[in-house]
């Protein structure tokens, strides 16, 4: 059975830290592939700046030539509010799935709609600084223990890259060198995004 990592996000825009995390997950967790899942309308976030079509195309450009990385447009195709539970329920049953989280997402995981069902459908891998403690919220820790499940640690040193910083730089006309794949930077410039 294939092992597939799932990395959800707004990808507004996709940047080098997203790609580094996906590559690290594929290698460290021995995944057959990692799917980047752009959100249609994330319920816990501010409105997105780039259209779904632009965000999807930027991901396609960013992962071109990386066979272990793929884009899964399931949330864009569904439209409306984006809930992870709907996404995991729509996944084909012929693979084992690992949902990739950051420590910030882990801290508020129990606020996600039907979080227990999500944790029952997929394994949870948390990108954490090597050597840093990995602490699940008490409610999640209790649920995991009761269901004989555990968090998977994904050693990953955080990178000082954020989509909001990139959008700010682009709006000011500042450099984004070292933050975006070159193909994505060219696409953004060609389409005048984030100005």
From Swiss-Prot:
The keyword Transcription does not apply. Belongs to the NadD family. It is an enzyme of class 2 (transferase). This is Probable nicotinate-nucleotide adenylyltransferase. Catalyzes the reversible adenylation of nicotinate mononucleotide (NaMN) to nicotinic acid adenine dinucleotide (NaAD). Its EC number is 2.7.7.18. It comes from Bordetella petrii (strain ATCC BAA-461 / DSM 12804 / CCUG 43448). InterPro entries: Cyt_trans-like, NadD/NMNAT, Rossmann-like_a/b/a_fold. Keywords: ATP-binding, NAD, Nucleotide-binding, Nucleotidyltransferase, Pyridine nucleotide biosynthesis, Transferase. GO terms for molecular function: ATP binding; nicotinate-nucleotide adenylyltransferase activity.
